[in-house]
């Protein structure tokens, strides 16, 4: 069973004493790897809409899927025309968000090194809004600035919609583990103060960059790769709630951990029982 964390614009209000069931429920896929409408193939980033509709970057099927709550199959809303770089194709899409202002979905089309926008009312083709970027994670703030992580330059950039260049808001000082550097930034989250949280994948940490600062602070992990409670192992999908608590999917530890604000270690809330397909296990969560 795969597990994914939605990277949402809205902060969630999760009680400090919240508890999670040991077993998870499959809401999309789970019918073995494949390309049928009830299947997924290496799904990665996702977005959950207000009505619980889930948009999934179905990476190795080169498409974006829409799964309405309670349904057993999804619908292709972008791509699905084979791997390629035409306007109606995607190449290993890795993240997706919804822009309600324009009623469109924004896609990190990683294999084509571009960010695409597809109008939800026109599912036949999309338009390129950012080019020449080795994108991984996407999010949007409350002022409709778009944030994109770039593996090639080890930075996160903020873009006004329709802007091509953007502004560096995290990293951008080469590959490394100093507080002003990132090493393969993956998924990102922006809070209401416009602080940027970054899953710093190969540094095995989550970084927080407050607005207009030149370096970040470590808010989870940062003690080398490992599965101890004060460590992370290849952090991926991540979100932050209203209390500043961080929830992060750890790919190589096959778990989701929760780090309270200011804590020196986290606690496991999902998985952590080895790699597997049982309802209480995860398999390389991203």
Language model regions located:
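Blade/loop signatures of beta-propeller domains
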Residues: 2-26, 30
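Beta-strand-rich domains and repeat architectures in extracellular enzymes and scaffolds
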Residues: 10-13, 28-62
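Short loop/turn segments immediately following the C-termini of beta-strands
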Residues: 51, 59, 69, 101, ...
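Structural signal for beta-propeller blades
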Residues: 62-65, 113-116, 154-157, 166, ...
């Amino acid at each position: 069973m795969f597990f994914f964390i939605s990277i949402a614009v809205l902060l969630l209000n999760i009680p400090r004493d919240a508890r999670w069931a040991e077993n998870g429920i499959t809401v999309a896929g789970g019918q073995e790897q494949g390309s049928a409408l009830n299947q997924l193939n290496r799904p990665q980033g996702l977005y959950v809409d207000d009505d619980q509709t889930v948009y999934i970057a179905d990476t190795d099927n080169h498409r974006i899927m829409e799964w309405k709550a309670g349904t057993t199959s999804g619908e292709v809303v972008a791509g699905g025309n084979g791997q390629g770089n035409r306007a109606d194709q995607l190449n290993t899409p890795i993240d997706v968000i919804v822009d309600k202002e324009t009623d469109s979905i924004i896609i990190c089309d990683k294999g084509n090194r571009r960010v695409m926008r597809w109008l939800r009312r026109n599912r036949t083709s999309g338009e390129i809004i950012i080019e020449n970027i080795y994108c991984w994670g996407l999010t949007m703030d409350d002022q409709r600035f778009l944030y994109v992580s770039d593996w090639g330059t080890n930075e996160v950039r903020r873009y006004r919609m329709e802007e091509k260049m953007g502004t560096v808001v995290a990293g951008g000082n080469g590959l490394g583990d100093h507080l002003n550097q990132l090493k393969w930034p993956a998924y990102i989250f922006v809070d209401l103060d416009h602080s940027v949280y970054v899953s710093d994948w190969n540094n095995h940490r989550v970084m927080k960059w407050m607005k207009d600062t030149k370096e970040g602070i470590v808010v989870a992990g940062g003690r080398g790769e490992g599965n101890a409670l004060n460590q992370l192992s290849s952090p991926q999908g991540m979100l932050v709630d209203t209390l500043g608590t961080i929830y992060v999917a750890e790919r190589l530890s096959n778990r989701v951990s929760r780090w309270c604000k200011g804590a020196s270690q986290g606690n496991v809330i999902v998985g952590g029982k080895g790699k597997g397909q049982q309802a209480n296990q995860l398999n390389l969560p991203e």
